[in-house]
Design a protein with these regions (language model features):
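Redox cofactor-anchoring modules in respiratory/redox and cofactor-processing assemblies
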Residues: 1-130
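Local cysteine-cluster metal-coordination motifs and their immediate loop/turn environment
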Residues: 45-67, 90-107, 131-150, 172-193, ...
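Glycine-rich dinucleotide-binding loop and its adjacent helix/turn
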Residues: 206-220, 282-299, 322-378, 483-499
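Feature captures the FAD/FMN-dependent oxidoreductase FAD-binding
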Residues: 221, 226-228, 278-327, 419-432, ...
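N-terminal Rossmann-like FAD-binding beta1-loop-alpha1 element of flavoenzymes
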Residues: 226-249, 368-376
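Rossmann-like dinucleotide-binding cores of NAD(P)H-dependent redox enzymes
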Residues: 252, 256-287, 291, 346, ...
């Protein structure tokens, strides 16, 4: 008789693992607008199925919670029911033996604290209001609310110009977003239920690269109203575009010599080609927008002067101030610079020469990756990225980190900068770092703490600090604007309290964010400025979206955007991505499930909010 046997998976185990994978995909693809109470009940029942049954709080308590949630969803609950749910969850949380019990209870407590209105809706009206407002997941996830299923259907038919026209209804910078958008729309794509999310950004790139010159829509009749935009970045350009289409006279005041903001002075050409950016900006300006460059508000002109001449003002200054890391030696005469300073020089075509230099980049965001990859292209002999957390904790997009590593950059994770080593000429010659270890999770991210290891010296010729950007708000604060944590305080309508006719949005309100969020802020501001001026213009599109017919959506692999070989692309600043072929675009666009016609989204045409 054998003492041991090799464990092999039986049919039931294989089936269970397949079910787990299906469940994981379904959770990832959960659309916005779901009933939180119903979702929590489902989670409780799943936890109950996982329970071993040995401890009473888990075995009995979870079953009791499931029954109480059934009462809420059936409209049979009262205030007393809510109290019992809380007490039961607290009892499980503090007495369950393992995470199956107390993590389930923790979720219930979180649901009660954050969704009290949903509970009351079920108790008082017998239904959840969110069930009647469940939009298309990708449209809801896009900050600008672009009709994504619509333009994917147009790409599928090869109607690229129409796709661009449809995108412009909600986003005046389709080319920019086709190249560098963080594509949050893909995160909740319902196609994940079958295999993988649709490559939405890749399809948008297919449209803009093949559409040719697409004229902007005709502007409405002039209203006689004048609007000033302070800042010519993506947010300011977005607001200016829509306001001009509405018939208002728009003037942009730009501090630098060229428009584009961080698109020009923060995004290298290999990610966003300058020719593409210039063409997109020129298309926006073709609506009749006036531009005044090299004008700094507060120095060359005052806000009071602008306010007197214009009927409304939109402040959309970006995050162009660098942040100091605050360590000894950062004041070195040479060898230390900021990401903002470096990328700004590149944006002005003033390319620094890093030939043969050892460069250390401090930071873990997209800007840090841009700096590192640009340093390689500028001739650096060695590029090291220093980050105090793990690589998995970096805020940079995974593809950016992978791209940096493929181009030869070293990622030194769990290394916290301590001080900068200087020579007798006050030049930086190295960075001292302290090894870290991951500790408790705070605010959703693990916190690093000092490891019991010696400090390490990283020899280098240049240190680039890329730990974030700040907003230059001093002038506005001195003129009575409320500034909290370095940002201007504004309402969600972009209005400034007690400052009639002045609006603000984008990075100067939210802090440094993504391009699509700045564009969305400009769109919101334009609509509310238009209303403030006494109008209610709507931006429409006469593009006819193809009919969504029934078809069998079988599993099909996702088509990825191909990249130039790392060994070649790191030698220049030329674009690194190839576009889809017609065959690839047709296959990938055919994977779209058309949630604007099938599912809850069909009740609202796929759009949560109209202009």
């Amino acid at each position: 008789m054998s003492r041991l046997t090799i464990i092999t998976k039986d049919k039931a185990q294989v089936t269970m693992e397949s079910l787990y994978q299906d469940l994981e995909r379904r959770i990832v693809a959960s659309p916005p607008g779901l009933c939180t109470i119903d979702l929590t009940r489902s989670f409780i029942k799943m936890c109950l199925a996982q329970s071993c049954g040995k401890c009473v709080p888990c075995r009995v308590g979870l079953r009791q919670l499931a029954r109480l949630f059934d009462d809420v969803l059936d409209g049979n609950a009262t205030e007393e029911t809510l109290d019992v749910i809380r007490l039961t969850a607290e009892g499980i949380y503090y007495s369950a033996d393992c995470a199956i019990g107390y993590e389930a209870a923790k979720l219930v407590l979180k649901c009660i604290d954050g969704c009290e209105d949903d509970f009351r809706s079920h108790m008082e009206r017998g239904f959840c209001s969110c069930n009647s407002n469940q939009p298309v997941a990708c449209v809801k996830s896009c900050p600008a609310g672009v009709d994504i299923p619509g333009y994917i259907a147009l790409v599928h038919e090869g109607r690229y110009a129409d796709a661009v026209r449809l995108i412009r209804r909600d986003n005046p910078m389709p080319t920019t977003c086709a190249y560098i958008c963080e594509h949050p729309c893909e995160n909740r794509c319902k196609r994940t239920l079958i295999d993988a999310p649709v490559n939405i950004r890749g399809l948008k790139k297919m449209a803009v690269d093949n559409a040719g010159d697409v004229p902007v829509p005709a502007c409405n009749e002039p209203t006689g109203k004048k609007v000033a935009i302070i800042g010519g970045g993506p947010g300011g350009l977005s607001a200016a575009y829509y306001l001009a289409l509405m018939g208002h006279k728009v003037t942009i005041f730009e501090q630098r010599k060229q428009l584009g903001g961080m698109l020009r002075y923060g995004i290298p050409n290999y990610r966003l080609p300058r020719k593409k950016l210039d063409a997109e900006i020129n298309a926006i300006l073709s609506t009749g927008i006036e531009v005044k460059k090299n004008i700094s508000v507060g120095t060359d002109i005052t806000l009071e002067d602008i306010n007197k001449e214009y009927n409304a003002v939109y402040i959309s200054i970006g995050a162009h101030a660098d942040k100091k890391i605050g360590i000894d030696g950062e004041d070195a005469t040479t060898g230390v610079t900021s990401a903002v300073e470096m990328l700004r020089a590149i944006g002005d075509d003033e390319m620094p020469d890093y030939t043969g230099k050892r460069v250390v980049v401090i930071g873990g965001g997209n800007v840090a990756m841009d700096v590192a990859r640009s340093s390689v292209r500028l001739g650096a002999e060695k590029v090291s990225i220093v980050y105090r957390r793990r690589k998995a904790d970096m805020t940079a997009l995974p593809e950016e980190v992978e791209g940096a590593e493929a181009e030869g950059c070293d990622v030194l994770e769990l290394m916290s900068p301590v001080r900068i080593e200087k020579d007798e000429n006050d030049a930086a010659v190295g960075l001292w770092v302290q090894p870290q270890m991951i500790s408790r999770i705070k605010g959703g991210r693990p916190s690093p703490k000092t490891a019991a290891k010696d400090e390490v010296l990283i020899p280098c010729d240049l240190i680039v600090v890329a730990i974030g950007q700040g907003i230059e708000t001093r002038y506005f604060e001195e003129h009575g604007f409320t500034v909290k944590r370095g940002t201007i305080e504004a309402l969600d309508t972009s209005e400034i309290k007690e400052r009639k006719g002045i609006f603000a949005g984008g990075d100067c309100v939210t802090g440094p964010a993504t391009v699509i969020r700045a564009i969305a802020a400009g769109k919101v501001a334009a609509a509310n400025i238009d209303e403030y001026l006494g109008y209610h213009h709507e931006i429409t599109s006469d593009v006819e979206i193809p009919y969504a017919g029934y078809e069998d959506k079988v599993p099909c692999g996702r088509v990825e955007v191909a990249l130039r070989d790392a060994a070649d692309r790191k030698k220049d600043f030329e674009p690194i991505e190839y576009g889809f072929s017609c065959e690839e675009a047709c296959q990938e666009s055919g994977r779209c499930l058309r949630c604007d016609h099938f599912g809850f989204g069909s009740f609202r045409g796929g759009r949560e909010k109209q202009w």
